[in-house]
Amino acid sequence: MTAAKIIDKAILLLGYDTLKNTGSISGFEQSALTALNTVYADVFYLCNKEGFQEITDASQPVNMPENVVFDIMPYGVAAFLASSQGDSDNQLFFSRIYNLKRKNILKEMTFEDKIPTV
């Protein structure tokens, strides 16, 4: 999925889709890309140790597992976008959803317990 599609889903979740129809989204695009990169970095390091590269163009694909891209990232982007717009009710609502969903990434990871050899 591309960055633009994640941003579009977040905008739709927030009910800000009327911005697209009025043409007032142009100043909103940089905030949206910043929000996406913030969430992308957050979930990237839950799944990987290194290799993060910021998304610089909304047409770029987001290389994360499918469940992260479709089910987790849009809620985080929505939370940060709501915050940037001063929409505290939506910011709180989507932050809670994002944090609950983000916890599932850690549950899916397996940890191996090893006793060190001396």
Could you describe each region identified by the protein language model?
Residues S84-N90:
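Charged, low-complexity interaction regions
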Residues V62-I72:
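Structural motif
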Residues M1-V62, L92, R96, K103-V118:
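Conserved short "hinge" loops at termini or chain/domain junctions
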Residues D71-S83:
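Short, hydrophobic/amphipathic alpha-helical patches that form generic packing surfaces
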Residues F80-S84, K101-E108:
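Mid-sequence acidic-hydrophobic segments that form the walls
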